[in-house]
Every structure is written in structure tokens, then in C-alpha cells.
């Protein structure tokens, strides 16, 4: 897929301090990858470019996309970059335990590295999920001379892990920072996108979804009381009409809900799979996604993924973070979104015509 004019402006941006406000399904990963390629092909030394991703799988995907253009560029999580700095300083990284959190790594970097060479070009993905400690590490320790931060605070779903989306929101408002929009939504049908907007726009102007409909599909949204048997029947009906099990996501808020739905579908002889994103490499993720099974996932595990038909189990909008999590869930669906709520009484409606 070629870049649109908004993506091209970001890829070739000349300003030193840039924040990209990227909505769901707007081509953020492609834009970030092509920005790295642009810098590399422009002649920026590879060791002067640092790309911080949120997960190892995202780093692996970017390296695969870049091919030879990415060779010699640091691409990895903030944990792995802290490890890299320690290793480069001569610190024995074998002393670092795999389970150490970033607080411990940050302390070790402070203690063992007297001076960190400022990064010439820093690119940061998922900036909305950055916490205060990571922010200090980036701006007070590695001190990038040029930075481009990609963010969508509407998808900030890690406050429980210390993320502060206000950091990137406030940075983008500074006079010296240039902001670029990335708003063309190429995934969601029009009705699905409008449903997602209604969820998130309640949070005020900083969270307003300015996404522009670009998928060319209308999409369908149905809000129903939760009935597991009805969901199973709906999946089976779609299979009878030559759709695939792999066309379906069942998205849950908690692991216990995942287990409940997974074993229920198994007992209904519906092939299904579940996994945690952190446990998979990018290649393993692609393999699992391509298998002809219904994917039963937490909403957090589904972030960054998409499917034709999505069922969301009993999600409520009772605070800011839950609205962001709900927004992520809704924007996974391309053609059909079934939004369920806890059942008060049995209610069966044939909502989908599979002809």
C-alpha cells in the first residue's frame, strides 16, 4: 500500500521535534517504518537512529519490513535499549534478571553510566503508553536531538502499569513541537467507526476522535445482551454460509472471561485459539492468526490486530481507561461489531443475514 500525502509529509518531516497523532487503522506502523527507511537512505548513520517499540514483536515486525535498510539501527523496547546502553558501557548484563522491571534497569543505568551520548534521531512508538520513569529516561538521560513520537492517547490502555498519556498530550501543546495528524481510517466500516467515536468523544476535546472514514465499507454494529449460545450459533451460521472461523474475534476484558468463552466454544465443537501477545514472536503471531480458528483474546492482546467480525464481551464505559479500552475493542472490527452487555433476560434476535 502506497503512502498518502499525510504519511509522506511525516516521513519527510524536517522539524526536530515532532508528535504524530495517529488514530486507529491510519497506517501508523507503515509511516513509522518508512520514516526510518527515509532517514537511513538519506545518509543518517545507522548508529545515530534509535527506534523504541512497545513490544518485541513490534520490533521484529519493523526489522522484517525494513530489511537491509534496518541493518545496524537499534530497534527494540525501552527495556532492551537500557540493556544495550549498559552492555555498551561494559556492565555485565548477565547480572540482569529477565524479570527485572524498568525501575531496576533505570537505576542501573543511572548508577553505572556517567554520560550517555545524546541520540541524533529517536523514534518512539505508542508514546501514550509511556510512564514518568520512561519519560525521564528518554528526555533527561538519552536527550534526543531530534525526535518523532507516534501516539494515540485514545488507545491508552496501560494506566494500570504506570502509563501517563497526559505526558504526550502536554508535550504536543508546546510551542517548539510540531504535530502531524494521521487520521484516515482504512479498517473500520462507517457505522463501526461512528460507534467507536461515540465511546471516546465523551472524554473531552483532548480525546476527540478526528478519524476520517476511508475503508469504503459501511459496516454493521449490534448491541445485545450476552448469550453465549447465541454467539456460538451465530458463528456456526456464518460457517454454513462459507465464512471462516478465522474471521472471528471474541474479545474479553479479563483472562477469566477469555477462559470461560474459550472452553465454552470448545465444548460446542467450535475450533478456537487463545494467546498472550507477549508470549509470541511476530512469526508465531502470524502463524496463529492464519489458523482457521476463532480467536478468543483479551482486548489488550488484540491491540494492533483486526478482523472481519468482532464480538466484545460485556464491556462497560465506567471510567476514562475503560472507555479507551472499549475504543480499542471497537476499532478491531472491519465489517461487523457485536457489542454485548450482561444479560438481564433471555433475548434472541437474528441480527445478521449471512447471505
Report the location of each language-model feature.
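Core RecA-like ATPase module of SF1/SF2 helicases and allied nucleic-acid translocases
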Residues: 26, 56, 190, 240-343, ...
Amino acid at each position: 500500500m502506497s503512502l498518502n500525502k499525510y504519511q509522506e509529509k511525516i516521513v519527510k518531516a524536517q522539524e526536530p521535534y515532532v508528535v504524530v497523532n495517529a488514530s486507529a487503522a491510519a497506517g501508523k506502523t507503515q509511516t513509522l517504518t518508512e520514516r526510518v527507511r527515509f532517514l537511513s537512505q538519506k545518509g543518517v548513520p545507522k548508529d545515530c537512529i534509535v527506534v523504541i517499540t512497545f513490544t518485541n514483536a513490534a520490533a521484529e515486525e519493523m526489522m522484517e519490513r525494513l530489511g537491509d535498510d534496518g541493518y545496524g539501527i537499534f530497534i527494540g523496547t525501552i527495556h532492551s535499549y537500557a540493556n544495550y546502553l549498559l552492555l555498551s558501557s561494559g556492565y555485565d548484563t548477565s547480572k540482569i534478571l529477565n524479570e527485572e522491571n524498568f525501575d531496576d534497569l533505570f537505576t542501573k543505568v543511572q548508577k553505572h553510566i556517567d554520560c550517555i551520548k545524546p541520540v541524533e534521531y529517536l523514534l518512539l512508538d505508542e508514546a501514550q503508553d509511556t510512564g514518568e520513569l520512561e519519560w525521564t529516561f528518554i528526555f533527561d538521560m538519552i536527550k534526543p536531538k531530534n525526535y518523532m513520537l507516534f501516539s494515540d492517547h485514545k488507545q491508552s490502555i496501560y494506566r494500570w502499569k504506570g502509563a501517563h498519556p497526559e505526558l504526550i498530550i502536554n508535550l504536543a501543546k508546546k510551542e517548539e513541537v510540531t504535530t502531524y495528524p494521521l487520521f484516515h481510517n482504512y479498517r473500520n466500516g462507517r457505522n463501526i467507526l461512528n460507534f467507536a467515536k461515540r465511546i471516546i468523544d465523551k472524554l473531552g476535546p483532548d480525546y476527540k476522535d478526528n478519524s476520517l472514514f476511508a475503508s469504503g465499507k459501511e459496516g454493521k454494529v449490534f448491541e445485545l445482551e450476552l448469550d453465549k449460545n447465541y454467539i456460538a450459533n451465530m458463528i456456526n451460521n456464518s460457517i454454513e454460509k462459507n465464512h471462516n472461523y478465522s474471521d472471528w474475534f471474541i474479545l474479553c476484558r479479563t483472562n477469566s472471561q477469555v477462559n470461560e468463552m474459550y472452553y465454552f466454544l470448545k465444548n460446542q465443537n467450535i475450533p478456537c485459539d487463545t494467546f498472550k501477545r507477549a508470549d509470541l514472536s511476530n512469526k508465531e503471531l502470524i502463524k496463529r492468526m492464519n489458523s482457521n480458528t476463532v480467536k478468543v483474546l483479551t482486548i489488550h492482546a488484540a491491540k494492533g490486530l483486526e478482523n472481519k467480525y468482532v464480538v466484545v464481551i460485556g464491556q462497560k464505559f465506567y471510567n476514562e481507561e475503560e472507555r479507551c479500552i472499549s475504543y480499542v475493542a471497537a476499532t478491531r472490527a472491519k465489517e461487523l461489531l457485536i457489542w454485548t452487555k450482561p444479560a438481564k433476560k433471555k433475548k434472541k434476535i437474528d441480527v445478521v443475514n449471512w447471505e
